[in-house]
From Swiss-Prot:
GO terms for molecular function: 2-hydroxy-3-keto-5-methylthiopentenyl-1-phosphate phosphatase activity. One of its GO terms (biological process) is L-methionine salvage from methylthioadenosine. The keyword Amino-acid biosynthesis applies. Signal peptide: none annotated. It comes from Bacillus cytotoxicus (strain DSM 22905 / CIP 110041 / 391-98 / NVH 391-98). Its EC number is 3.1.3.87. PANTHER family: PHOSPHORIC MONOESTER HYDROLASE (PTHR28181:SF2), UPF0655 PROTEIN YCR015C (PTHR28181). Belongs to the HAD-like hydrolase superfamily. MtnX family. It is an enzyme of class 3 (hydrolase). This is 2-hydroxy-3-keto-5-methylthiopentenyl-1-phosphate phosphatase.
Amino acid sequence: MSIQIFCDFDGTITNSDNITSIMEHFAPPKAEEIKKQILAQELSIQEGVEQLFHLLPTNLHDDMIAFLKNNASIRSGFQEFVQFINKNDLSFYVILGGMDFFVHPLLDGLVPKEKIYCNETDFSKEYIEVKWPYPCDKHCNHHCGLCKSTLIRRLSSQQDFRIVIGDSITDLQAAKQADKVFARDFLITKCKEYHIPYTPFHTFYDIQNELQHLVEVKL
């Protein structure tokens, strides 16, 4: 048995949700309606995210990256948390419903690319098209887009101690599979609704302190 850590990015590693920031700054008002439908589970995550990004012209590529580099901030304690993970030789993956064009620049130097699982974007046409390299397997029918629960099944075994760190509806199916959940914001609401045990967190220092105890017990 080993400890396997699966961490969200938007609103978890970063202090704000980068997709939300992009939509608020660059997208037309229709984006807000689509976002509400996703959170209310009236639209699948895949359908909603696809619709959101198709609102954005591809000629905004450089502007969006520059905007996020200037405005996105990494949550306190994350760099030290990564050092702790590496020191203890723990398996750590970033799995997110966000896009390659912004996650790789923001995590450059912090997390190796091969440990990041995200959606891909096509900028070859007038509007952004989303590619879905990690779809749901036969055990999931939630049309997740990037299916976190499928990736967890692929990257770990049931004998492993699975930890999920997240903040939103996109982390719910993953949380259902976890042995331990660190949650904040809307994921706390969903954990309460589905009676999923969770530990709240504000910074990665909070998670590291809890994880230190787990490492001592599990390893």
